[in-house]
Amino acid sequence: MPSSFDLLGEMIGLLQTEQLTSSLACPLPNALTKRQDLWRALINQRPALPLSKDYLNLEDAYLDDWRASFVPVSVKDCQKTNYTSLFLYHGDIRYLAVDAIVNAANSELLGCFIPNHGCIDNAIHTFAGSRLRLACQAIMTEQGRKEAIGQAKLTSAYHLPASYIIHTVGPRITKGRHVSPIRADLLARCYRSSLDLAVKAGLTSLAFCSISTGEFGFPKKEAAQIAIKTVLKWQAEHPESKTLTVIFNTFTSEDKALYDTYLQKENNCE
């Protein structure tokens, strides 16, 4: 079985031979981390076009190795809160072994094309594998228009421990600007649409990232309040959906502190 180092080298060679990306003349690095960065840059930039069976076999082997490098996190490993159906998980959402994780997507729904970008969309698409971009392309081709803010789409999670990914596009907020009622409602719609889709698909566990708080600039405090209030209100309006466990995933210490505070009933997100 080839090592991850060798698999990366072969994938890079195939991607460079395609000449579909801008990073064509880079020599093959000798360091593992440099190879990882170059492969990720190439696959991040690659258009949503079919891939060869040879490449997909290599990618499957490499991502299987990645998947075996950590212990997946289940609902029972997550932090309990004062609400029996709400949990917290602080860490990398890609490690969650739940029915579905929520991806903060953009209106193209094809993932992030910026090489090695730090957004959640990039991380999820990269390590789910390139079949995810192709699946999203099929959705967008059938839809025939950009994805509207506040809607939700379901795909397989491919190489991630989760079974599915729910993709939703949140609202953008210019830094320093007040959160208008319209944008607050658009963010709430992201949560409602994701919950509705999860129930429609028969899912029993759903993990939300902090939608719109990264590249889209939504203030973290307001976003956390909207997220929790919206989910609690949705649960109250859908008593038949008590089997759906919701996990709020936090990645920064600021987000964790906010959710820790607001998920105490006495605070009530005010």
From Swiss-Prot:
Q: Which UniProt keywords apply?
A: Glycosidase, Hydrolase, Metal-binding, Zinc
Enzyme Commission (EC) number? 3.2.1.-
Indicate which residues the UniProt annotation says bind Zn(2+): 112, 117, 119
Q: What class of enzyme is it?
A: hydrolase
Query: Which SUPFAM superfamilies does its entry note?
Result: Macro domain-like (SSF52949)
Q: Entry cofactor note text?
A: Binds 1 Zn(2+) ion per subunit.
GO molecular function: any one? poly(ADP-ribose) glycohydrolase activity
**Which cofactors?**
Zn(2+)
> Where, in this chain's numbering, is ADP-D-ribose bound?
92-93, 106, 119-121, 212-216
Enumerate the catalysed reactions. 4-O-(ADP-D-ribosyl)-L-aspartyl-[protein] + H2O = L-aspartyl-[protein] + ADP-D-ribose + H(+)
Disulfide bonds, which pairs?
Answer: none
Q: Which residues form the Macro domain?
A: 73-267
Primary role: ADP-ribosylhydrolase that specifically reverses the SirTM-mediated mono-ADP-ribosylation at an asparatate residue of GcvH-L, by releasing ADP-ribose from the target protein. May play a role in the regulation of the response to host-induced oxidative stress.
Q: Which family does it belong to?
A: Belongs to the MacroD-type family. Zn-Macro subfamily.
Under what name is this protein listed? Answer: Protein-ADP-ribose hydrolase
Q: Which organism is it from?
A: Streptococcus pyogenes serotype M6 (strain ATCC BAA-946 / MGAS10394)
